[in-house]
Amino acid sequence: LTLDETFIAFILTVLNKKQSFIYETKAWRIVMSWIGVCDAEQVQEDFPFSGNVDGKEIGVYLIDGEYYALEDVCPHAYALLSQGFVEDGKVECPLHEAVFDVKTGQCLHGPGGRNLNRYPVRVFENQIQITFVEETVA
């Protein structure tokens, strides 16, 4: 059983107004909550924030006034992407030059091999928060 994009958008709309969300049917249960990653001031254009959230390395980027959160480990070389070069909405792996689109997680060039998971982001009381509905680009 999979969740379609419309339903995920609905959940995120509800969740954006609350701290947590629970949805149950006879077949499945969805429990989502916002998790604090960092303060908004810790993320600057061209200088992303990197942190471990619930055992996952997460990179938070500020691009054109919007925040984006991606898995922070390069799928090819396992380097922290947030330590790479950030320009024009793209991040380059510091080891082998794989390039990813920060807004979508899409691998644009190099040996990355796959797209990155991205995570819904909100700013709540000056704190960057994410939730783990993993979104990947097909």
Residue spans of the language-model regions?
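Short cysteine clusters
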Residues: C74, C93-H96
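N-terminal amphipathic/basic-hydrophobic helices that include classical n-h-c signal peptides
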Residues: L1-V31
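Short cysteine/histidine-rich metal-coordination sites, predominantly Zn2+-binding motifs
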Residues: D88-P94, C107-L116
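Short helix-to-coil "ATP-lid" hinge immediately C-terminal to the conserved N-box Asn in the Bergerat
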Residues: V99
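N-terminal pre-ligand scaffold of iron-sulfur
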Residues: Q19-D88, V102, N115-A138
